């Protein structure tokens, strides 16, 4: 389990250096310094979803406000649920799957069908941490089979009569409505979810929330007055959406190879996450902090630090355009056929 109040995505990540390198300022761009149109098309906005609309409706409104090519949210919230709805814009939407798989935190109001001793309520809630079995609700978009989901932490915040306010950190795909039902069953009195708000989603927290009105105001300020300050505040670089993933930092000379579909060779690495595991999803970055691709690690950190040749990672989703950095590789070297 995670430390109290922490999702796995909030674990501190340490980079270890494999080899020295420098980055050419003539190529690429630091994410926060991208030209405004590119900044928006490669951005993410942490929307505070109001009660009422569906998640898809909110994403459609974001798309309409900004005039972007597309917008995709990272994890649906039911119409009555409020809170974090990270919405990726334009080219950044290719990173949506990486964010959807990250852990989530909610604050929930549970209504018990009968007032129960507070000590018992707290004890039963504690028992719902760790792996739990869940059957998706009847009104669900997924096949109804029993699944295992992990509850990282569950903290009872307040009990008043038959109402229980709690905070829960859980694996993606956990049904909080079903969790409330199961807690009620375990207490022997029954219960249901009264209200729900999402407070964390992967690397996103309530500290960076913006409303749809905030977004609209920032857009109007930019379009009518030429002031980019607010639009750059409410929209974050797409790199924020994958900041929770283990990472490898690339040499400038390796970047275009990845953009062209090649696997990452060991010589292209300058630094890497201290705890990479073979087979896990990782993010490949430039020395300027730009996201190049999502990839699958082909070696662990220990193996990579010892290796001088071989394939370090294979791309899953390429995020950067070919030609952003100059070619510094050969097709033969990287295994790309002519």
From Swiss-Prot:
GO biological process, one term: mRNA pseudouridine synthesis
Domain PUA: 245-320
Keyword tags: Isomerase, tRNA processing
Xref: Gene3D superfamilies: Pseudouridine synthase, PUA domain
SUPFAM superfamilies, alphabetized: Pseudouridine synthase, PUA domain-like
Function: Could be responsible for synthesis of pseudouridine from uracil-55 in the psi GC loop of transfer RNAs.
Recorded family membership: Belongs to the pseudouridine synthase TruB family. Type 2 subfamily.
Record protein name field: Probable tRNA pseudouridine synthase B
Taxonomic source organism: Methanosarcina barkeri (strain Fusaro / DSM 804)
Gene expressing this chain: truB
């Amino acid at each position: 389990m995670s430390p109290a109040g922490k999702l796995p995505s909030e674990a501190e990540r340490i980079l270890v250096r494999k080899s020295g390198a420098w980055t050419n300022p003539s190529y690429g761009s630091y994410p926060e310094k991208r030209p405004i149109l590119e900044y928006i098309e490669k951005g993410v906005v942490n929307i505070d979803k109001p009660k009422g609309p569906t998640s898809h409706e909110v994403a459609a409104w974001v798309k309409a406000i900004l005039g972007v090519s597309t917008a995709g949210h990272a994890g649906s919230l039911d119409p009555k649920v409020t809170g974090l709805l990270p919405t990726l814009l334009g080219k950044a939407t290719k990173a949506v799957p990486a964010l959807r798989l990250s852990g989530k935190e909610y604050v929930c109001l549970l209504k018990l069908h009968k007032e129960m001793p507070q000590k018992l309520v707290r004890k039963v809630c504690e028992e719902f941490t760790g792996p739990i079995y869940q059957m998706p609700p009847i009104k669900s978009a997924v096949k109804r089979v029993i699944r295992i989901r992990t509850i990282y932490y569950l903290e009872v915040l307040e009990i008043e009569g038959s109402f229980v306010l709690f905070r829960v950190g859980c694996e993606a795909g956990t049904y909080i409505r079903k969790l409330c039902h199961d807690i009620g069953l375990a207490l022997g009195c029954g219960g249901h979810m009264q209200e729900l708000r999402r407070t964390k989603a992967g690397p996103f927290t309530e500290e960076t929330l913006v409303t749809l009105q905030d977004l609209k105001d920032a857009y109007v300020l930019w379009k009518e007055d030429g002031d980019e300050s607010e639009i750059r505040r409410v929209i974050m670089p797409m790199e924020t959406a994958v900041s929770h993933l283990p990472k490898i930092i690339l040499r400038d000379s390796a970047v275009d190879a990845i953009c062209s579909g090649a696997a990452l060779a060991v010589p292209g690495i300058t630094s890497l996450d201290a705890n990479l595991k073979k087979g896990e999803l990782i993010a490949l970055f430039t020395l300027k902090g730009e996201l190049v691709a999502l990839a699958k690690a082909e070696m662990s950190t220990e193996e990579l630090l010892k290796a001088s040749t071989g394939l370090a990672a294979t791309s899953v989703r390429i995020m950067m355009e070919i030609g952003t950095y100059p070619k510094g590789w050969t097709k033969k070297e990287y295994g790309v056929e002519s």
